[in-house]
Amino acid sequence: NTPNTFGIFVLDCVFKWLEENGGLEGAISRNKAKSNLLYEELDRSDFWLPHAEKKSRSAMNVTWRISDQSLESIFLKDAEEAGLGGLKGHRDVGGIRASLYNGCTIDSVKALVKFMCEFEKKHG
């Protein structure tokens, strides 16, 4: 059997990137910072309705709804136009989902939170 050489190459690249960026501890720290920033905004106002209870929240996939669900399609359209794509929730659950994987930067989460604040001011 021939090993999956491309898969091995990609793993090597990912492992090197992890090592150069603080290892697993660095990745965990960055991911917590990103999710904490977003959850702080979600918890700040009744405009946003996070799905998960605080003790069960994910650091990778943050899901929520808007208290007035008729605004969700507007939020998603406006977010896409602002360069914040891929926020549509799971097809079975709906709502909004931000996936904060390792490649997602803290600056992109800050941009999302800023957009959310502006959206709430306009529609809240």
Predicted regions and their residues:
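Conserved PLP-dependent catalytic core of the aminotransferase class-I/II
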Residues: 15-51, 77
